[in-house]
UniProtKB/Swiss-Prot annotation:
Induction description: Up-regulated by testosterone in cancer cells.
Membrane topology per record: Multi-pass membrane protein
TM region(s), chain numbering: 4-24, 35-55, 106-126, 146-166, 176-196, 210-230, 244-264, 286-306
Cell compartments where the protein resides: Golgi apparatus, trans-Golgi network membrane; Cell membrane; Cytoplasm, Perinuclear region; Mitochondrion
Expression tissues: Highly expressed in pancreas, testis, and pituitary and moderately in the kidney, liver, uterus, heart, prostate, and brain, whereas expression is lower in the ovary and colon.
Keywords carried by this UniProt record: Cell membrane, Cytoplasm, Glycoprotein, Golgi apparatus, Ion transport, Membrane, Mitochondrion, Nucleus, Transmembrane, Transmembrane helix, Transport, Zinc, Zinc transport
InterPro entries per the UniProt record, alphabetical: ZIP, ZIP9
Annotated signal sequence range: none
Family label: Belongs to the ZIP transporter (TC 2.A.5) family.
One Gene Ontology term from the biological process aspect of the record: intracellular zinc ion homeostasis
Listed Pfam families: Zip
Role played: Transports zinc ions across cell and organelle membranes into the cytoplasm and regulates intracellular zinc homeostasis. Participates in the zinc ions efflux out of the secretory compartments. Regulates intracellular zinc level, resulting in the enhancement of AKT1 and MAPK3/MAPK1 (Erk1/2) phosphorylation in response to the BCR activation. Also functions as a membrane androgen receptor that mediates, through a G protein, the non-classical androgen signaling pathway, characterized by the activation of MAPK3/MAPK1 (Erk1/2) and transcription factors CREB1 or ATF1.
Identification of the protein by name: Zinc transporter ZIP9
């Protein structure tokens, strides 16, 4: 019951924090130039968050269980076995250790690639409905907005699964670490999403709806995961390090959205095929500085979180 109360409070805090962070660009009236600058900053936040926060946290969650398990196993072995068996046991232990590490390396790559490929397929399915329209440029732009929101919602849902799986372990420290990691990138992601949608010309009411769906995805999925897991499922999940796998899958979706949609849209790359179009001029020095700053902010926050 205590776990249920804690997961409920964490979910509520996640919803409110994410929505408030996303409302900031809507609450302030920006000029055209300022809006572009904020959008570029938001794009930097998305990229920096994917690379500096989500991937390391996912890898950490994946390895933490194994390292803790090895620590307990080693101490038990030390207490139980006789000294003449110690050398033999340590050889077996070393072999198991390297085997586990090989498995974990595979988990990291597979989870990231699956997340990226999943979003790629979603994007292509969306694009297949676009080619039949009269104005492919406008249709592609509209599709880009939907895919960006969908990608971030899928990512947030995977975050929710990670938090729900963490809550099911009944370890408060694990729950808090996963919660802080999620909040560190959900707030910048909400800001980045809203500024991108504003730049893309979506009406404010629709932006609020997109933001609400994004803000709800993680809390709802964390509750569903927590309530839907039976005791045997929880044990199976802890065996395969579900928290780490879910976070790395969501990192793959996040990377796709940040690099394939948001950055090209902001830089005007690939959306205009005419040589004289203004969209292909690239970024000004100030915009590049904002992009770099956006990439560095999550890195600084994550370094502060680790210490």
């Amino acid at each position: 019951m205590d776990d249920f109360i804690s997961i409920s409070l964490l979910s509520l805090a996640m919803l409110v924090g994410c929505y408030v962070a996303g409302i900031i660009p809507l609450a302030v009236n920006f000029s055209e130039e300022r809006l572009k600058l904020v959008t570029v900053l938001g794009a930097g936040l998305l990229c920096g968050t994917a690379l500096a926060v989500i991937v390391p946290e996912g890898v950490h969650a994946l390895y933490e269980d194994i390292l803790e398990g090895k620590h307990h196993q080693a101490s038990e072995t030390h207490n139980v076995i006789a000294s003449d068996k110690a050398a033999e046991k340590s050889v077996v232990h070393e072999h198991e250790h390297s085997h586990d590490h090989t498995q974990l390396h595979a988990y990291i790559g597979v989870s990231l690639v699956l997340g990226f490929v999943f979003m790629l397929l979603v994007d292509q399915i969306g694009n297949s409905h676009v080619h039949s329209t009269d104005d492919p440029e406008a249709a592609r732009s509209s599709n880009s907005k939907i895919t960006t929101t969908l990608g971030l919602v899928v990512h947030a849902a995977a975050d929710g699964v990670a938090l729900g799986a963490a809550a099911s372990t009944s370890q408060t420290s694990v729950q808090l670490i996963v919660f802080v990691a999620i909040m560190l990138h959900k707030a910048p992601a909400a800001f980045g999403l809203v500024s991108f949608l504003m730049h893309a010309g979506l009406e404010r009411n629709r932006i609020r709806k997109h933001l609400l769906v994004f803000a709800l995805a993680a809390p709802v999925m964390s509750m569903v995961t927590y309530l839907g897991l039976s005791k045997s499922s929880k044990e199976a999940l802890s065996e395969v390090n579900a928290t780490g796998v879910a976070m790395l899958f969501s990192a793959g979706t996040f990377l796709y959205v940040a690099t394939v949609h948001v950055l090209p849209e902001v830089g005007g790359i690939g959306h205009s095929h005419k040589p004289d179009a203004t969209g292909g001029r690239g970024l000004s020095r100030l915009e590049v500085a904002a992009l770099v700053l956006g990439c560095l902010i999550p890195l600084i926050l994550s370094v502060g979180h680790q210490h």
